[in-house]
Amino acid sequence: MKEHQHRGLTSAQVEESRRLHGDNLITPRKGDSAWKLFAEKFRDPIIQVLLVAALLSLAMAFIDGEFLETIGIICAIVLATCVGFFFELDAMRRFKRLNLVNDDIPVKVVRDGEMTEVPRRDVVVGDLVYVENGETVPADGKLVKAVSLKINESTLTGEPEVDKTTDERSFDAEATYPSDALSRGTTVVDGDGEMIGEAVGDRTEAGRVTEQSSIASEEPTPLYKQLTRLSRMIGKIGIAVSIAIFVAMLAKAYLGGELSTGDWVQTSKELLRIFMVSVALIVMAVPEGLPMSITLSLALSMRRMLKTNNLVRKMHACETMGAVTVICTDKTGTLTQNRMRVEEIIHYASIDERLLAEIIAVNSTAFLDADANVIGNPTEGALLIRLREEGFDYAALREEAPIVDRMTFTTERKYMATIIQSKTTGKRLICVKGAPEIVRAMCMPDGKDAQVNEQLLLFQGRAMRTLAVAYAETTAERCEDALRDPQMLFVAVAAIADPVREDVPAAVARCMKAGIDIKIVTGDTPATAREIARRIGLWHDETDSSRNEMTGVEFAAMSDEELLERVQALKIMSRARPLDKQRLVRLLQRKGEIVAVTGDGTNDAPALNFANVGLSMGSGTSVAKDASDITLLDDSFTSIASAVMWGRSLYRNIQRFVLFQLTINFAAIIVVFVGSIFGTEMPLTVVQILWVNIIMDTFAALAMASLPPNPAVMNEPPRPKDEFIITPAMARTIFTCGTIFVGVLLGMLFYWRATTGELSLEQLTVFFSVFVFLQFWNMFNAKGFEACHSVLHDLRGSRTFFLVLLLIAVGQVLIVEFGGPVFRTTPLTWVQWLEVIGYTSLIAIMGDVVRSIRRRISPRPGCR
């Protein structure tokens, strides 16, 4: 066992364990079956009304022997429900695939004698697993080492903090789980430890008693709610108009004698026809596709955003990112490369080199793998790399100096302390490293304050992170006791460089051009933070002053009323603590800002929760990730800028779908209403209307959701969070295009009535095709809404859009040419097809011309 604790499993043992005990995956809870989801579609009130109409039509078909229209209605209903079911099922599967990313979280294990990181799914029974503050326990296991280890078991027992130890004398006999046992899904709230995996996957306690959590939020997004209300409002209008049309057509039939023929079969057929027309109009008028467009757009966007290193954990974050006005960002790893390197170590006390190496090695929780890659905190890793370069084996130093107690680093205390039994001195030592001003306050006076401060300012002016190291002899068992009256020796200061990411200055410029304020909230010193801000283009010595920066201490000392006057101008908060970040978020929100916040530590969870969008780091703790809405897999600020672009583009695409659908709703309701009032019956059959409805709801939603993000949206200011989705420009477009559609369609009907009397089958077929192709070309107008280029721009990036259009066009031609009595159509000549397509295309051509003229006369901010 002792050898195993040091060496871990071999590669062969890992494979054998996986064969015997399986993967570390919890089987997802069994969701609704595909059949149940399909059946759910028939609970829609609109579908139920259609089914009633279909049954009545079937009854009449048995009487007169004409089944074609009934078959067409039933097929159309099934097609409509199948298409909706398919897209809902596809979206659900996409969300499930995103959930699997949770099992790719890296876990530190020892294999073949080397510390390495593997995905959580690859942890096996027998693995030697290392866990530390903020991490989630990946499997059930037994502790073999514990240093000040505290576990949050609230997911299993409700206990937020349970002490864990390997010392049997300290075991809690009343604990729910043994004091040396760790359970999958619990989190480390303090300390660190090593355990041997005893159960993985479904055999863990979590696998038996809990259900797998889902990334997809059950709470509807604000935009979904807005569109649902809009859909219901328009639906009520459509139902009211349908009732009015039913009454008007009923009165017309009664006055025309169609209901008083004495033939009950004929009378029933006429009543059924009137009823079917009214029902069909309700189907067309109710824009039930609006809420579905949100789900579809979010599903597609979440998958695409994953490719740009944005893992969306909560659906609302996609749309909210588009409204963000302030980004509060960390410095390390987000703005910088997080590739720490010790540039220089300044010694302030003469001690043995091995003792300094021992102090650095044991007072750390980081590791180096076989390739010298850092596992754990990058700053601590840089110190270990420096030890290796100087010829010291940090692992051997740790092994030879047993740990008595440890106080882990937190952003509140800004230091880490460890009590060891030193082999170098043969005595018990308390070792401390952390922020120089904090560590120096623990040390004995040495008359070097001015020298130390001068050197620190030089390092900070070069944007370097600084860590101080100190130690003292002690007899205490606990760090808290040893630090009550510390008289430590101030040994050295390490200057650690972390270059700015090359892509960050451009990303910051993009966000600032998009009207988004950037605020650096960091635990580093003011000088270091200011230099980083200068390098990324956020800080300008000519225009910025002390009003644009403050420390966490200054921030905490001010009242909310005082801060409300300064928070919007603030660019840098240095030496900040997590509660400072949370308070800053709340103050900014009180000023009406939409705030996105980055965080990677357990203590960042409150700020991530309170922010409108919480952005956790891929390298951050599990607690931070669980509290966030989006995880930046590459930790980069550039990914934040990409998320903003995605959010704005998503909102714009949904607006385009709303524009498209409401234009058709407007035209359809007016045409049928006016037609019925003036005695012109509805020239579209129920089956035709259902086909049109499929185009309006499903195909259009897919087409608009598939449009690629437009970088030009980053040249515009943020939209108000509570902005109504139908803007004045959209309302004007809906009214203008809808009026043109009404004029064209009613003009055709009245012209034919005046010249030929009754409408022929050929005329009805042409009318049906014109109606569909007006929608076809109007999709181009919707695509061009608020665009900076012609609708034909970026054909390659809009492949799905054009494929959907092709599907609609081919479907319409096939229906007309081969639909026959079922769709009440007759084949058209190629000349007629050219006329239909050519004349209706004018709506797209003229729309593009008008938009082009407007762009020249009054360029939009995003297109300049």
What kind of feature is each model-predicted range?
Residues 1-717, 725-726, 739, 753-754, ...:
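Conserved cytosolic headpiece of P-type ATPases
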Residues 696, 741-742, 765-780:
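Generic alpha-helical transmembrane segments
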Residues 707, 732-748, 773:
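Alpha-helical transmembrane segments of multi-pass integral membrane proteins
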Residues 718-734:
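The cytoplasmic-loop to transmembrane-helix boundary for the fourth helix
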Residues 750-759:
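Long hydrophobic segments that form regular secondary structure
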Residues 760-764:
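Transmembrane alpha-helix entry/boundary detector in multi-pass membrane proteins
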